[in-house]
Amino acid sequence: MSILVSNDLRNALHRRSTARFSVPPSARSASFAWPAPTARDGTNMTPVPRARQKNERLRSRSLVFLFTVLAAFLHAPLAAHGESTRAAATGSSAMETEPTEATALSAYLAARAWLDADALPAEGDAAARVPLEATTAVCVLLRLDGRLVGAGHDELDAPRSTAPATAAGPELLLRRAVGRAVARALADSTIAAVRAELGDKVTARLSLEVELGGPLRPLIGRTIADASRRIAAGNEGVAVLRGERAHRAFPSRLLAADTASRTDRIIAGLLLEAGLPAKDLPEFGAEERVSLARFHSIRLRADAADAAPAAVTRAGRLVSQRELTEGFVRASAAQLAARLAAQVVPADPTRPDGPQRLLGTLNPTADIYEPPLAAPSDAALASLALAHASRSPLLPEPVRVQAAKRAAALVGWLAALPDPERGVASDCLAAIASVELGLEEPARAVLRDRIGAAIRSQLAAGDGDDAADATRIALLVAAAHALGDAATQRDLEALMVRLRVHASERPARLADAALPIAFLAASPTLAEADRAPLRALFERFASLAAELQVGSGTTVDTADLRSADLAGGIDLPGSASGVADTQSLLMMTGIALVEAAHSLEEWPADPVARSALLPYARFVAQHIATDPWVGGFRNPRTLRGLVRGSLVRDDCPPGATSAALLYLLSTLESGVFRDGAAARDASPAADPAAPLDGAAGPK
């Protein structure tokens, strides 16, 4: 995650400043052989031999199914945001035309029984027919130790209406989808090796995900780009209709491949799949009968073959605003601090006492870091976040100690970097971190000299007329003021004059520098004449944030289910991910830092800013990688506790975790929880003990 904000946010600020701104019978059958399923796409399906199950194992599996059924209907988490919330969001009439969790559970149990028995009923057998009310398509994913090894789907043809499927229509959808997924899994080299060693029981080792798609509904849009903006990527499926034939893209498949964010490309791919040229919608004639559709779906997934399933979405689960108690946020901040500290590792694994680096962006789908190590700008932001955490009395002592050690290690590495490998931003953030840590020589001296030279160069070059120049000035002023002796008083005052001009006349140019300016504005030694324009700048930032905040005036519990997980986020126009994401974290962290800087007696609170902090804290918590979302990947422990860049992507960039840690701590320090803004009726489970190993935390 870059410390820079996109041009879209700067443009929005500029506009404001210039305008005043039943388990089915099949689940009890384990005696069928796997016949070769007939694939619609002509794929060669390898038949699976008849299973030989022992009576003891069958009894054990029966107990697991009984437990799963009871858990599904009696345990709250599975239905926490199910039918009751769906009814609130879409009305009872919509409930009757969409697959329910009960229907999805029946499908899951039937498919699980077939996998455990290593046997699939023939399509002509009654056991293969699983009633799936209101379902027009089924997608099945199979994983081995978190790695996707098989996927299959089946779907009904698309009548030119939005009516749900008839009761008899979809009964073989599950059977066909499971057969195709298993056939693909058996072609996997690892599965083939396991099968050679264990025999016919290989499918019983696979974890299962079942997705039921509801009826197709028209997707309105003059162009592909226009239609794409109307889809809740990752939470809704999309389809291309050509005559009576539908070609669907399922959220589960898209998310598993980490391709859900580009709906426009998905539609283009579906057009090709339908045998159509990849051209835009207005270019198709009426005689071609081409249109777009969307569909809701429900997904059930288990992390292991013998685990109970849970309903999952692109976010994993929906974090309720009621969970945002002070205890929950403190536990989340402790988790982030521990995880971020654990991401600082020796640059050379053979030299544990040598220089330390910050790990790069984690790609959980491939279970690798891309790049392996973070850029200096990300390392500098991490050093600042860890330094701030090391001074926070809100965190457990062991977490603070580790945060201080890792922050100091990063500052030392940054100070030792040669000129071509670093930039002013890295030096300035590292310098502020060194002050927070109370570091002495030599790292601090090196940074002081660099910043002093950069200030003299900036003054000699004159005042530029772009956002990069304004950002550079803000970073230098903030770092020099924190260090105290990096520049002469005359040079510092001259640079401060330029910063005040930018803050008053060209505030949009300072969006990238919201974080260092917040540290400057929070400094108790800053003159009031210099603080006033900065305070006004953050009032503008807060006003813009409130204007762009998702779900303003509603709550996450009553929001549209398609996008309720984005409530509280800042919806930047033209965002690369297409949804509100963590790109706004640094600006919001600056707002929270300013609100936390002074007591109400010294500095009046900004009600607009404070009203945005708690909803955004929910949004941040929604992006923390926790269960059940992490269970769909190869290495949940490595992933758990990091922060996702976007809910429609899997990647966890280091800058997102750093900025999220700073934001949660600043929000706690601002006192908004003491304002009574947070609901106090959250369940005790919402306030877990703070983890110290960085691998577990709020679920």
Describe the role of every protein-language-model region.
Residues 374, 550-564, 575-591, 596-699:
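CBM-like carbohydrate-recognition segments
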Residues 91-308:
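Basic nucleic-acid-binding interfaces
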Residues 2, 6, 10, 15-22, ...:
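Low-acidity, Ser/Thr- and Arg-rich intrinsically disordered low-complexity segments
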Residues 317-324, 380-398, 428-442, 472-486, ...:
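Well-ordered alpha-helical scaffold segments within catalytic/enzyme domains
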Residues 64-75:
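Bacterial N-terminal signal peptides
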Residues 363-380, 395, 412-427, 459-470, ...:
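Solvent-exposed loop and edge beta-strand segments that line ligand/cofactor-binding
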Residues 309-377, 456, 614-640, 647, ...:
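Low-complexity, Ser/Thr/Pro/Gly-enriched N-terminal "stalk/linker" regions
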Residues 321-340, 395-417, 440-462, 484-503, ...:
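Extended, well-ordered alpha-helical scaffold segments
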